[in-house]
Curated annotation (Swiss-Prot):
The keyword Glycosyltransferase applies. Residues 1-15 form the signal peptide. The keyword Glycosyltransferase applies. The active site is at H16 (proton acceptor). This is Anthocyanidin 3-O-glucoside 5-O-glucosyltransferase. UDP-alpha-D-glucose binds at Q338, H353, W356, N357, S358, E361, D377, Q378. One of its GO terms (molecular function) is UDP-D-glucose:delphinidin 3-O-glucosyl-5-O-caffeoylglucoside -O-beta-D-glucosyltransferase activity. GO terms for biological process: anthocyanin-containing compound biosynthetic process. It comes from the Eukaryota.
Length: 461
């Protein structure tokens, strides 16, 4: 009997690559051959061997016309258009070549990330079944679904008390995915609509969600037409279930380390337990100069040791007026191993943009958060983090609405770090979710069982 073979197509952004690679490793550990399909830009920067893959993961790349990545000033609309047209052809060619390859096992199933919705249509042309790998919380998919299925008027009305079905929390405007806000370009909303229309082309489509049952029990069941399957947290084994101690990274970092980045862990070890404030806003957020200054002021006013990841374009320098003062209190780097940082004993809290990977990692490691959401799913994640899971606090912008003042940043950090009643409750809640995340990934845990059932059904494992 030939080995099962799954093609995994993923958008070439860090937030997509990380969970997709981890999912690929899970498949390989189940003795499934994986073809990992992404752009040349991502492939060039990725580790070609994933930990625990047993040689079962191979990479296929295609040129999207932006082989050096999307650069400042590039046309985003053209980028997505080229990605789609070239990706469709490349995926079709890959599947056709596999059909006639006598040496390789035949691809029998396609999994795709949400900006590659066209991959499902290509799969259908080759009479292959497919599933969406949803890399945000189930709640975000629910909101999009309800928006395009009868609730657009309520959401568009500008209310700060939006009631949706499925047991979702009451939402304010700032809690919505940014693609649904009036300030967002219509093409982003169209991308989400296209994804849902793709799912509608199947009966009871399967959606693999990077979450776990205990975290979103209602959201995972809110859409009757979908079968949402929680398989997360999609985090390297060494940091979660411990089944593979060698699996200590995602294996696909798209960013280069700076010259002073390697000693992060050594520096962390010089600080007391639970004392360090970690600040990182992910791979896509470009923080304004004025906001950088306010973050710096907030950190200095706290007086606590901090590790701050500041991404700059190649050849640029970090320009903050109080840089020398900052260096005396904390450490500024362009890159760090976030998994190593979040699991370090000296870490006290995470000031985060609330991207889902960062949020889920914090939950899985029991790290309380200060939420600093920017766009897409981050406002929703911050809402869930503060009001549903109660593992942190969310900053409020000033009256102009464009900048979060240093005083507000300091206030939020102190709420998490000062050891008072609220701080204690946040840490207790964070510890509870840490335990539940680990239970989901135990041998008989919910996410492990969910994946087993899925694989048994779709590939006959």
């Amino acid at each position: 009997m030939s080995r099962a073979h799954v093609l995994l197509a993923t958008f070439p952004a860090q937030g997509h690559i990380n969970p997709a690679l981890q999912f690929a490793k899970r498949l390989a550990n189940a003795d499934i051959q994986v073809t990992f399909f992404t752009s040349v830009y991502a492939w060039r920067r990725m580790s070609r061997t994933a930990a625990g893959s047993n040689g079962l993961i191979n990479f296929v790349s295609f040129s999207d016309g932006y082989d050096d990545g999307l650069q400042p000033g590039d046309d985003g609309k053209n980028y997505m258009s080229e990605m789609k047209s070239r990706g469709i052809k490349a995926l079709s060619d890959t599947l056709a070549a596999n059909n006639v390859d006598q040496k390789s096992s035949k691809i029998t199933f396609v999994v795709y990330s949400h900006l590659f919705a066209w991959a499902a249509k290509v799969a259908r042309e080759f009479h292959l079944r497919s599933a969406l790998l949803w890399i945000e919380p189930a709640t975000v998919l629910d909101i999009f679904y309800f928006y395009f299925n009868g609730y657009s008027d309520e959401i568009d009305a500008g209310s700060d008390a939006i009631h949706l079905p499925g047991g979702l929390p009451v939402l304010a405007q700032r809690d919505l995915p940014s693609f649904l806000l009036p300030s967002t370009h219509e093409r982003f909303r169209s991308l989400m609509k296209e994804k849902l229309e793709t799912l509608e082309g199947e009966e009871k489509p399967k959606v693999l969600v990077n979450s776990f049952d205990a975290l979103e029990p209602d959201a995972l069941k809110a859409i009757d037409k979908y079968e949402m399957i929680a398989i997360g947290p999609l985090i390297p084994s060494a940091f979660l279930d411990g089944k593979d101690p060698s699996d200590r990274s995602f294996g696909g970092d798209l960013f280069e380390k700076g010259s002073n980045d390697d000693d992060c862990l050594e520096w962390l070890s010089t600080n007391p337990r639970s004392s360090v404030v970690y600040v990182s806003f992910g791979s896509f957020v470009n923080t304004t100069k004025s906001q950088m200054e306010e973050i710096a002021r907030g950190l200095l006013d706290c007086g606590r040791p901090f590790l701050w990841v500041v991404r700059v374009n190649e050849g640029e320098e970090v320009l903050i007026s109080c840089m020398e003062e900052l260096k005396r209190v904390g450490k500024i780097v362009s890159w760090c191993s976030q998994l190593e940082v979040l699991t370090h004993p000296s870490l006290g809290c995470f000031v985060t943009h609330c991207g889902w990977n960062s949020t889920l990692e914090s939950i899985s490691f029991g790290v309380p958060m200060v939420a600093f959401p920017q766009w897409f799913d981050q406002g929703t994640n911050a809402k869930l983090m503060e009001d549903v899971w109660r593992t942190g606090v969310r900053v409020r912008a000033n009256e102009e609405g464009s900048v979060v003042d240093g005083d507000e940043i300091r206030r939020c950090i102190e709420e998490v770090m000062d050891g008072g009643e609220k701080s204690r409750k946040l840490r207790e809640s964070a510890g509870k979710w840490k335990d539940l995340a680990r239970k989901a990934m135990e041998e008989d845990g919910s996410s492990v069982n969910n994946l087993k059932v899925f694989l048994d059904e779709v590939v006959g494992i």
